[in-house]
Amino acid sequence: MLEQCDFMELTKEVLQQCKGFTCKDEDITEFFTQDYADYAYQLLGKSYCFVKPDTSEIVCAFTVANSSVKVDSLPSNLRNKLNRKIPNAKRRPQYPAVLVGQLAVSDLFSGHHVGDELLDFIAPKPNGRIKNLAIFINPYSAVVPRVYTPRQKGV
């Protein structure tokens, strides 16, 4: 579905053109309709959205920020997996990462696997636009329904 949408920075003008944004969670709706601008101004994160061009509806929105992975704070199996890819001479105590601070799918598009497509778009790719080693998703609730793994194209 996202391939048929326009990718753009979330701005006041976009929200006005699209007649706003709503999702199942009031706090996240408030973030993407009001608070996102303060986060961008304070350099805490940048918000983006996908807009359906034929209807001018915001399909989904997300906020990303620069972060890092502190290797010593990882469980040994993850630490080994991360370090295994890096030559000894270039290993560091922390590595750059992307933090997904907010992520939401519009109520209008809920149940269409848009969240999966969005995570595939954001996730690091070996030769893609994001050169970081890791992506963090800050779960809103204490219960995370499943672990995200990028889907293979064509599968």
Give the predicted meaning of each segment.
Residues 63-102:
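Conserved acyl-donor/pantetheine-binding loop and adjacent beta-alpha core of acyl/acetyltransferases
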